[in-house]
Amino acid sequence: MATTVNSDLIIYNDEAQTAYLERVQDNLDVFNASSNGAIVLDNELIEGDFRKRSFYKIGGSLEHRDVNSVGKVTAKKIGAGEAVGVKAPWKYGPYQTTEEAFKRRGRPVEEFSQIIGADVADATLEGFIQYATAALRAAISSNAGMVVTASIETDGKKTLTRGMRKFGDKFGRIALWVMHSSAYFDIVDEAIASKVYEEAGVVIYGGLPGTLGKPVLVTDTAPADVIFGLLPNAVVITESQAPGFRSYNVDDEENLGIGYRAEGTVNIDVL
C-alpha cells in the first residue's frame, strides 16, 4: 500500500510570494515616481508600536543691524517638535479553492497561488493609500491654518489656488494633488465649461491647465469632499515588518483544496 507524503505534494508558497514581490516592486517604483515623491511607499524594519522622532523648530530670519548702536540684543531660543509614526496591522484572506475547481478547467493548481499573490500586492497598495488618505485627513483637519473651504462648482480652479495661498511664496513646493474621482471630473467639467472660443470643432480654453501644472493622484479611497495639496514626503507608508504568507492544504473537506492568507504591518508617518 502506498502512502502519499509531503514530497509528493506541491504547496506553492514560492509562487505566491514571488508574484507578490514582483507586483509590489512594480507598484512601488511607479507610485513613488508618479506621486512626485509626495506619498512614499518604503520597506524598513521598525521595532515597537511607534516610531518617534524629534526635530528642531527655528524659522529664523535676517534682521537689520544698526552699526551705530551699542544696545543689548535679546537672545532667541529654538524649539522642538515630535513626529510619531503609528503602526497599522493588516490581514488578507483567507481564500480557499478545491483542486478540482482548477483541474476541471484544465488549469494547473499553482495558478491559484499566482493570481492570489498578484492580488494581495494590489490589495496592499490600495490599503496603503487608504491609510495615507485617512492619516492626511486627520492631520490636516486638526490644523485649521492649513484648511480652506471652497467648491469646484462655485469657485472653479480657485479652489486649488486658495489652497496654494496657504503656502505663501512656497506654493511651488506643492508636489501633488490627491482627490476623489468626482472632484477630478468636476475640475475637468469646469475646464470644458470655461472654453472661451469654439469654431468648426476647434476649441480654445482660457486660463491655466485644470490642475495648475501639478500631477494628480485620483483615488476613490480619498474623501469625496476633500482635495489634498501635498509637499514632497508628505506621508510615508513603511512596510515595517516582514509580511507573512501562508499556503496550506485543506484536507478535512469532501474535496481536497488549498488555501492562502497573508498579514503584515505598516508604519504611517505624516510630515
Residue ranges, per PLM feature:
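Extended, solvent-exposed, turn-rich assembly/linker loops in the middle of proteins
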Residues: 138-214
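Extended, compositionally biased alpha-helical segments that mediate assembly or anchoring
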Residues: 2-8, 239-271
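Short helix/loop capping segments that flank catalytic or ligand/cofactor-binding pockets
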Residues: 63-65, 186-189, 195-196, 238, ...
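Short acidic, glycine/tyrosine-flanked loop/strand segments centered on an H-E-D-like triad
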Residues: 78-106
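Alpha-helical scaffold segments that mediate packing/assembly in large oligomeric complexes
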Residues: 99-170
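Extended serine/threonine-enriched, polar tracts that run as long, contiguous segments within proteins
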Residues: 202-234, 238-249
